[in-house]
Amino acid sequence: MTERRPDLIPAWVDGTLTPVDKLRAHQEGLRHKAVSVFVVRGREILMQRRAMGKYHTPGLWANTCCTHPEWDETAKDCATRRLEEELGITGVSPVYRDTIEYRADVGGGLIEHEVVDLFTGRASPEMTVVPNPDEVM
Protein backbone atom coordinates (compact mmCIF):
# COMPACT_ATOMS: atom_id res chain seq x y z
CA MET A 1 0.00 0.00 0.00
CA THR A 2 1.30 3.43 -0.97
CA GLU A 3 1.71 6.01 1.79
CA ARG A 4 -0.91 8.76 1.58
CA ARG A 5 0.44 12.13 0.45
CA PRO A 6 -2.49 14.57 0.68
CA ASP A 7 -0.10 17.42 -0.08
CA LEU A 8 0.59 16.07 -3.60
CA ILE A 9 -2.14 16.61 -6.19
CA PRO A 10 -2.28 15.94 -9.94
CA ALA A 11 -1.29 19.08 -11.87
CA TRP A 12 -0.07 19.77 -15.37
CA VAL A 13 3.51 21.00 -15.60
CA ASP A 14 4.75 21.67 -19.14
CA GLY A 15 1.81 19.65 -20.48
CA THR A 16 2.50 16.55 -18.35
CA LEU A 17 0.32 15.43 -15.44
CA THR A 18 2.67 15.44 -12.45
CA PRO A 19 2.39 15.13 -8.65
CA VAL A 20 2.70 18.71 -7.36
CA ASP A 21 2.52 20.24 -3.90
CA LYS A 22 -1.00 21.62 -3.44
CA LEU A 23 0.17 25.02 -2.21
CA ARG A 24 2.57 25.36 -5.17
CA ALA A 25 -0.27 24.60 -7.59
CA HIS A 26 -2.27 27.48 -6.11
CA GLN A 27 0.66 29.89 -5.81
CA GLU A 28 1.69 29.35 -9.45
CA GLY A 29 -1.84 28.99 -10.81
CA LEU A 30 -1.03 25.56 -12.24
CA ARG A 31 -3.87 23.75 -13.99
CA HIS A 32 -4.80 20.91 -11.64
CA LYS A 33 -7.45 18.27 -10.96
CA ALA A 34 -10.28 18.84 -8.51
CA VAL A 35 -13.49 17.19 -7.36
CA SER A 36 -16.83 18.82 -6.54
CA VAL A 37 -19.74 16.98 -4.90
CA PHE A 38 -23.37 18.04 -4.51
CA VAL A 39 -25.39 15.88 -2.11
CA VAL A 40 -29.14 16.23 -2.57
CA ARG A 41 -32.12 15.07 -0.52
CA GLY A 42 -35.38 15.65 -2.32
CA ARG A 43 -35.27 19.31 -3.39
CA GLU A 44 -32.56 20.25 -0.86
CA ILE A 45 -28.84 20.63 -1.58
CA LEU A 46 -26.42 20.23 1.32
CA MET A 47 -24.01 23.17 1.41
CA GLN A 48 -21.10 23.84 3.74
CA ARG A 49 -19.13 26.84 4.89
CA ARG A 50 -15.35 26.52 4.70
CA ALA A 51 -13.55 26.61 8.06
CA MET A 52 -11.79 29.84 8.97
CA GLY A 53 -8.48 27.96 9.20
CA LYS A 54 -8.42 27.06 5.48
CA TYR A 55 -5.46 28.62 3.65
CA HIS A 56 -7.67 30.09 0.95
CA THR A 57 -11.26 31.32 0.85
CA PRO A 58 -11.94 30.71 4.56
CA GLY A 59 -15.57 31.22 5.54
CA LEU A 60 -16.79 30.87 1.94
CA TRP A 61 -20.11 29.10 1.41
CA ALA A 62 -19.66 26.23 -1.05
CA ASN A 63 -21.19 23.06 -2.38
CA THR A 64 -21.31 19.92 -0.24
CA CYS A 65 -17.66 19.08 -0.76
CA CYS A 66 -14.89 20.43 -2.99
CA THR A 67 -11.36 19.10 -2.88
CA HIS A 68 -8.37 17.78 -4.80
CA PRO A 69 -7.66 14.12 -5.47
CA GLU A 70 -4.38 12.83 -4.15
CA TRP A 71 -1.83 11.65 -6.70
CA ASP A 72 -2.92 8.18 -7.98
CA GLU A 73 -6.44 8.53 -6.51
CA THR A 74 -9.53 8.35 -8.70
CA ALA A 75 -11.97 11.25 -8.62
CA LYS A 76 -14.81 9.02 -7.37
CA ASP A 77 -12.68 7.54 -4.57
CA CYS A 78 -11.66 11.08 -3.62
CA ALA A 79 -15.29 12.24 -3.54
CA THR A 80 -16.31 9.33 -1.30
CA ARG A 81 -13.31 9.79 1.02
CA ARG A 82 -13.77 13.54 1.45
CA LEU A 83 -17.52 13.30 2.13
CA GLU A 84 -16.62 11.18 5.14
CA GLU A 85 -13.56 13.21 6.21
CA GLU A 86 -15.22 16.63 5.92
CA LEU A 87 -18.82 15.88 6.89
CA GLY A 88 -18.93 12.38 8.38
CA ILE A 89 -21.16 11.27 5.48
CA THR A 90 -21.15 7.58 4.59
CA GLY A 91 -23.47 5.53 2.42
CA VAL A 92 -23.68 8.12 -0.37
CA SER A 93 -22.40 6.83 -3.71
CA PRO A 94 -21.20 9.77 -5.84
CA VAL A 95 -22.30 9.67 -9.50
CA TYR A 96 -20.10 11.39 -12.10
CA ARG A 97 -21.97 14.11 -14.02
CA ASP A 98 -19.50 16.24 -15.99
CA THR A 99 -16.10 17.93 -16.07
CA ILE A 100 -15.61 21.71 -16.12
CA GLU A 101 -12.57 23.95 -16.11
CA TYR A 102 -12.17 27.40 -14.58
CA ARG A 103 -9.50 29.83 -13.45
CA ALA A 104 -10.02 32.32 -10.60
CA ASP A 105 -7.92 34.57 -8.41
CA VAL A 106 -8.98 33.58 -4.88
CA GLY A 107 -6.96 36.27 -3.09
CA GLY A 108 -3.80 36.18 -1.05
CA GLY A 109 -1.68 35.59 -4.15
CA LEU A 110 -3.43 32.27 -4.84
CA ILE A 111 -5.05 31.14 -8.09
CA GLU A 112 -7.42 28.24 -8.68
CA HIS A 113 -7.03 26.78 -12.17
CA GLU A 114 -9.05 23.62 -11.87
CA VAL A 115 -10.27 20.81 -14.06
CA VAL A 116 -13.19 19.72 -11.89
CA ASP A 117 -14.99 16.37 -12.01
CA LEU A 118 -18.55 17.04 -10.83
CA PHE A 119 -20.48 14.44 -8.82
CA THR A 120 -23.92 14.24 -7.28
CA GLY A 121 -25.10 11.94 -4.53
CA ARG A 122 -28.51 11.14 -3.08
CA ALA A 123 -28.95 11.37 0.67
CA SER A 124 -31.41 9.25 2.57
CA PRO A 125 -33.88 11.02 4.88
CA GLU A 126 -32.01 9.60 7.88
CA MET A 127 -28.52 10.61 6.74
CA THR A 128 -26.55 12.32 9.50
CA VAL A 129 -23.91 14.98 9.01
CA VAL A 130 -21.02 15.31 11.47
CA PRO A 131 -18.93 18.29 10.31
CA ASN A 132 -15.16 18.19 10.84
CA PRO A 133 -14.39 21.62 12.40
CA ASP A 134 -10.97 21.67 10.69
CA GLU A 135 -12.80 21.61 7.34
CA VAL A 136 -16.21 23.25 7.77
CA MET A 137 -18.01 25.68 10.07
Regions from the PLM with identified roles:
Residues 7, 33-35, 65, 96, ...:
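Residues that flank catalytic or metal-binding motifs in active/ligand-binding sites
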Residues 67-137:
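Unchanged
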